[in-house]
Design a protein with these regions (language model features):
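Metal-dependent phosphohydrolase cores
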Residues: 1-114
């Protein structure tokens, strides 16, 4: 099974498809962010970070899934997990003001709420 399918299976095992997120589910939102990042030809680490961008919970949304960092690293890889951790543990204002283009692309995809 490929990495994308492993990620999808993990997200479904956490019942993210049953968690409301605006007018859709948390699962649909995360897949939408991933798909947007793929469409704009982002590298794999950014796309998989987008797929898991709010898995730890942040100042705007927390599904209280509480996965360990090691668990997420094993699923999406250490580079993607590092982006996810930063996304969830840094204020949005600070992220938007950073020079990190990878994070900014995830922020953009999230903001568009694809």
């Amino acid at each position: 099974m490929n990495q994308y399918h492993n990620c999808i299976n993990y997200l479904l095992s956490k019942k993210t498809n049953l968690i409301p997120h605006g007018d859709k589910t948390f699962f649909d939102h995360m897949v939408g962010v991933y798909n947007f990042l793929r469409k704009i030809n982002q590298p794999n680490d950014v796309c998989f970070a987008g797929l898991f961008h709010s898995i730890y919970g942040n100042e705007f949304f927390d599904a209280e899934l509480n996965p360990s960092r090691e668990e997420i690293k094993n699923i999406i890889g250490p580079e993607a997990e590092s982006l996810v951790f930063k996304f969830n543990n840094t204020s949005r204002e600070e992220l938007w003001n950073s020079d990190n283009v990878k994070i900014k692309n995830i922020l953009l995809a999230n903001k568009l709420d694809i």
